[in-house]
Amino acid sequence: LKGLSVIDYFTGDGGYHDAISLQDAVELSWEKAKEKAPNLPKGWWELSKLDPGVKLEFIRDYWFNALPYQPHVYHFLDTFFAGVLEVGVFLAQKRENSPHEAFFTYRLKDRLYLGRPPLLEKEIERFKRSISYPLPDDYLNFFRIHNGFAKGGDSGIFSSGALEEERKWFMQAQEGFFLGEKSVDPELLLPFYRSFGLDIYQCFYKDWYPDGEVGNVLCSLSDRVISSWKEDETLAFPTFLDWLIFYLE
């Protein structure tokens, strides 16, 4: 990413046909921007008009307010946002004549993160009811910030809609997984993240409740194995936010 603008990323490695920086598109009114990108929240459009420093401080505080208080998470987020060079709102168009989509971007020195618009509280509740799985509260709270989030070039954390599709794909493999020599039923696993171009998922695991809610483990679809929390450096995490810290580092 060094030397590349966010626009360059979208129209280059990001594979988008067109991208617009709302920070720079001073001639674009709210009505015109919403017409281009129907999923653009009014708050994001207003945020794009603020000074860069104010915008960064606002979104950092928004993360703090949206997520449950955990000292180590707040400490990490302070460090993460101290390394963010700029945040912005962009409208990106995948194909000519298709609608643009809204993204919130976080640019660091050597990487970029992109988030899609958040869910409303009633949408989070609807999503929770639609999934027959004990979703952790910290994971659900993240949808207040972004409904879909990824490092540039990665598939990333699924949106609520994509999660349903990915789960179907994940469940098509009828064989079970293995945790060491123990067989694990795929029904116990719920994928929430996929590594781009690989059959590597991060999944909630219903048989592991380390902190009162389900933990998450690395799952290899090709090898049919999941990581063990009983060993060091196996990418098994007691909470969604612990995994998110790993992803943002």
Residue ranges and their predicted role:
Residues P68-H75, S130, P134, L235:
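Alpha-helix boundary/N-cap detector
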Residues R95-S159:
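Extracellular-facing segments of soluble proteins and assemblies that are Gly/Ser/Thr-biased and enriched
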Residues S5, H72, E123-R126, D138, ...:
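Exposed alpha-helical structural elements
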Residues L77-V84, G88, F127, I131, ...:
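Hydrophobic, Leu/Ile/Phe/Ala-enriched alpha-helical segments that form helix-helix packing faces
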Residues A19, Q23-V54, F58-I59, L112-R116, ...:
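Long, low-complexity, intrinsically disordered segments enriched in glycines and aromatic residues
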Residues D8-T11, T79, V84, Y106, ...:
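Compositionally biased, low-complexity repeat tracts
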